Design a protein with these regions (language model features):
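A short mixed-secondary-structure module that forms the rim of ligand-binding clefts
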Residues: 53-88
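Short, Lys/Arg-enriched N-terminal segments with co-localized hydrophobic residues
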Residues: 4-21
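Charged, gly/pro-rich active-site loop segments
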Residues: 92-151
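A short, Trp-centered hydrophobic/proline-enriched beta-strand micro-motif
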Residues: 27-41, 80-82
Length: 151
């Protein structure tokens, strides 16, 4: 029984550290306000500004509309990269995006960004949220060594 208790403590410490690292990425993207999401369409890179980042059920989420080209690009290739700059530092996040079609996930995003409610609704069939999976974030600057965060 003691081994199981030790395992639970280890798991909790791992989960705590993972969430702490993920929060650092969340905080950076929130502070930047705008980040750039890169996808691929065929052999052509596509980059556009985004502004939504939300933590829901221990995962980082972004939001778009199903009618947008970015949605179709992610469906073909869910590997994306995000880049943002603020306060003399920049972040690059390489990850896979996984769609979460649950109303609760969409509602959480729209509650965090009420200004989007004029264009989106969790029940509209267009609102789309994705969470980041297998993410590696690198925070860099010209004055310090890069910090690598995996979540």
């Amino acid at each position: 029984m003691k081994a199981n208790a030790d395992y639970v403590i280890f798991f909790d410490e791992y989960t705590f550290e993972r969430r702490k690292m993920m929060k650092r990425v969340y905080d950076f993207l929130k502070k930047a306000e705008t980040y750039y999401l890169a996808t691929v369409e065929g052999d052509q890179p596509r980059v556009r500004p985004f502004g939504t980042i939300n933590e829901f059920e221990g995962k980082l989420y972004i939001q778009t509309g199903k009618v947008k080209p970015v949605s179709h690009q992610i469906a073909v290739n869910p590997k994306v990269e995000i880049c943002a700059f603020t306060g003399g530092e920049w972040i690059r996040v390489a990850c896979e995006l996984v769609e979460d079609d649950r109303i609760e996930a969409k509602k959480s995003m729209l509650d965090a960004y009420p200004n989007l409610r004029g264009m989106y609704d969790e029940n509209d069939g267009n609102t789309q949220v994705f969470y980041m999976k297998n993410a590696t974030a690198t925070i860099s600057s010209f004055t310090s060594e890069p910090v690598v965060i995996e979540f």
